[in-house]
A protein has these predicted regions:
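Terminal, low-structured helical/coil segments at or just beyond the last alpha-helical repeat
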Residues: 304-395
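Helix-start (N-cap) detector for alpha-helical repeat units in TPR-like alpha-solenoids
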Residues: 23, 57-58, 91-95, 125-126, ...
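Structural signature of tandem alpha-helical TPR/SEL1-like repeats
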Residues: 37-44, 70-82, 104-116, 139-158, ...
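Structural marker of alpha-solenoid helical repeat scaffolds
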Residues: 52, 86, 120, 162, ...
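Alpha-helical segment of the N-proximal tetratricopeptide repeat
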Residues: 19-58, 62-72, 103, 137-145, ...
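Long, contiguous interaction/recruitment modules in multidomain scaffold/adaptor proteins
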Residues: 1-21, 112-136, 141, 155-164
Length: 395
């Protein structure tokens, strides 16, 4: 009797098995997306790779790096911690964890992890580059270790020796040069990093900041615009565009970008303060006092967003600007009781701030004028910026 082997036939109604993609294919996609500046798709592809193979610490590290560039610092921390759980001896995992923690202000723990990374591999160029960023950020805090900037300079040179042509090395050199006031040299380093990958928003933001400090406002605006296009949900490019347009006297555009910044992060009181300043410069007195009132008093927005007040302290010129602009706007509305309260606060808390005291005097003068004349009510629907008393401000 003849026998035939009949191949398995698919059963009706039962789906055919779908070929499973390899984790390597997802990693390739992620790297391609990253090089194109598509950070969110890159993140999603790395996550797909992890779903396909959850036991590769290197993929968690790569994911964490992109998450930092995207500004997802808490998520980057979790990814790096997952890598460490899989391999506690991974120098890169500890390095990226330290890097992610520094962006959250936890510099002590960040430095602990970066030191562990270098203990595991003292020739890890990226760890040295990340250490530069950590130390520079740390140096701006009251608890900064002695010699943080000097150590950052040393670490940046080690990174250059180990990997002179890496994006992270150019970025680290740019950061330390900027921190030491060498803006032209910092610009050169950031441009070299952008030549390697022009699709990382933070690099354009950093380059724009240095152009702005040097007074190259058109170039700064171009870089901030690039950063904004690459990461439209980040309020920082909008904030810097707002301040830069205000510096060159284009107050209508400065107001628009200030509004965009607040839309991106409605709970940031500092952004509310900036918006209040720009409303003032466009002669929207009522709107100005509303936004600046959040800075001085805190409270809740109409949609219930909580906002914390920002105290007026010495050596904080931006905060001082919020306070004296609030006082100026109140005086414009003939609310001189509140306005003079701001004057007293300025004179008591920051008496050596010449700019703030000068504007406090302007508030008093405006209120004295209000006593002897009937103020003409402003027309916020048709502002005349030229008629406003524009406070002098640090750009």
């Amino acid at each position: 009797m003849n026998r035939f082997i009949i191949p398995n036939q698919p059963q009706y109604g039962v789906p055919s098995p779908t070929p499973t993609r390899s984790p390597e294919s997802f990693i390739t996609d992620a790297e391609t997306y990253f090089n194109q500046g598509k950070l969110i798709p890159a993140i999603n592809s790395y996550k797909d790779a992890i779903t396909s193979n959850p036991n590769d610490p290197a993929v968690y590290v790569a994911l964490a790096q992109v998450q930092v560039f995207q500004g997802q610092y808490k998520e980057a921390q979790k990814s790096a911690e997952s890598a460490i759980l899989l391999n506690n001896d991974s120098s890169m995992a500890h390095a990226v964890l330290g890097w992610a923690l520094s962006f959250q202000g936890d510099y002590l723990e960040a430095e602990t992890n970066i030191k562990q990374a270098l203990l595991l591999d003292d020739r890890n160029a990226l760890a040295h580059a990340y250490y530069v960023e950590i130390l520079v950020g740390y140096s701006y805090t009251p608890t900064a270790p002695f010699g943080a900037i000097e150590k950052a300079i040393e670490e940046s040179r080690v990174a250059v020796d180990l990997a002179p042509d890496k994006l992270e090395t150019y970025r680290a050199r740019g950061i330390i040069l900027e921190a030491t006031g060498q803006y032209d040299e910092a610009i050169d380093q950031y441009k070299k990093a952008i030549d390697i990958n022009g699709n990382i928003p933070d690099l354009h933001l950093a380059l724009g900041i240095n152009y702005r400090v040097r007074g190259f406002y058109d170039l700064a605006i171009a870089e901030f615009t690039s950063a904004n296009a690459l990461n439209p949900n980040d309020p920082n490019p909008d904030l810097y565009l707002s301040r830069t347009y205000a510096t060159i006297g284009e107050f209508a555009q400065s107001m628009q970008y200030a509004e965009s910044a607040v839309a991106n992060n409605p709970a940031d009181t500092n952004l509310r303060g900036n918006l209040g300043v720009m409303y003032y410069r466009n002669a929207y007195w009522e709107k100005s006092t509303k936004e600046l009132g959040y800075v001085i008093n805190g409270g809740f927005t109409e949609d219930g967003t909580p906002l914390n007040a920002i105290n007026l302290l010495p050596d904080a010129p931006r905060i001082a600007e919020y306070y004296f602009t609030y006082g100026l706007a109140l005086s414009r509305l003939n609310k001189c009781g509140e306005a003079l309260g701001i004057v007293r606060m300025i004179n008591e808390r920051i008496p050596t701030d010449e700019l703030a005291v000068e504007n406090a005097t302007a508030i008093v003068n405006r209120c004295q004028q209000n006593l002897v004349q009937t103020p003409i009510p402003p027309f916020p629907t048709s502002p005349n910026p030229a008629a406003a008393t524009t406070p002098t401000a640090t750009p």
